[in-house]
A protein has these predicted regions:
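N-terminal glycine-rich phosphate/pyrophosphate-binding loop and immediately adjacent elements
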Residues: 1-100
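Core beta-strand elements of the Rossmann-like FAD/NAD(P) dinucleotide-binding domain
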Residues: 228-240, 244
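Short, well-ordered coil/turn residues at beta-beta hairpins
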Residues: 139, 244-245
Length: 251
């Protein structure tokens, strides 16, 4: 199967073939211009819940609601978690960083710190890109529960510690998708439909996709990859080599 982090597998339950996700299950990080310009928006059906997310901590009898509307969110976090920090400033500053990320996505330019300083300023670059997630969350929030919730993407998307430099960037990065305006949603039948449709688009463009292969060697001097495909040893030459997520890591 194709898919990278969104690869699927299948099993038989009560005589019926069932597809299931081996890695990611929700759609969120894709830029909207890719979603539209590739034609994916016309080929798949999606759904993004607009109701507040419900958060439970240990011994909670009722959930804390994560509202999209900032005034409601501020009140909820204050009432439930005794948050005394600046929730509004956090969201506003995060949006500035997200807009920068989305801009360089669209331009197809690799991000760099000098560009970040020019676009969002020295202070936000230090706090939101170069700094640690812990320092970022301590800067805006007082409640440990708020910090745990707002920093969840750091621990779910990498093995890095909150204390490591550069981990603050994970938070806006994981909210930078624009298909659902920074939120996460679902693809009818499963997120692998995205990969399936992209494979069809690639086939229409004449791109060859080689699956079920194991890379044995990469000769960067000769631009050559040696691999085994269906028990046959083969070689392929390249001008540019791009590495994407393998199917096993996210599982």
């Amino acid at each position: 199967y194709v898919g990278g982090a969104c690869v699927k597998d299948s099993t038989i339950i009560n005589g019926k073939k069932i597809d299931f996700a081996q890695g990611a299950t929700v759609l969120g990080m894709m830029p909207n211009f890719i979603y539209k310009e590739t034609g994916l928006s016309k080929k798949i059906k999606t759904f993004c819940p607009e109701n507040p997310k419900l958060i439970y901590f240990e011994n909670d009898n009722t959930p804390t609601r994560i509202f999209r509307e900032i005034t409601l969110l501020e009140k909820e976090l204050k009432d439930r978690w005794n948050e005394k920090g600046d929730v509004k400033a956090f969201r506003n500053d995060e949006n500035k960083v997200i807009e920068f990320i989305q801009k360089i996505y669209k331009e197809g330019t690799p991000p760099n710190l000098d560009q970040a300083v020019n676009e969002i300023g020295k202070d936000l670059t230090k706090l939101w890109i170069k700094g640690s997630a812990k320092d970022l969350l301590d800067h805006y929030f007082t409640s440990e529960k708020t910090k745990v919730y707002m920093g969840m993407t750091v621990i779910e998307s990498s093995p890095s510690s909150y204390n490591e430099k550069g981990t603050s960037f994970t938070i806006p990065l994981m909210d930078s998708g624009s298909v659902f305006g920074g939120y996460w949603g679902f693809v009818k039948q499963g997120i692998w439909k995205i990969s399936d449709e992209l494979l069809e688009l690639n086939n229409e463009l004449g791109i060859e996709t080689i699956l079920n292969s194991e890379i044995n060697d990469i000769d960067t001097n000769k631009g050559r990859i040696s691999y085994t495909n269906n028990n046959l040893d083969s070689k392929i030459y390249y001008d540019y080599l791009l590495f994407c997520t393998d199917p096993l890591t996210p599982t």
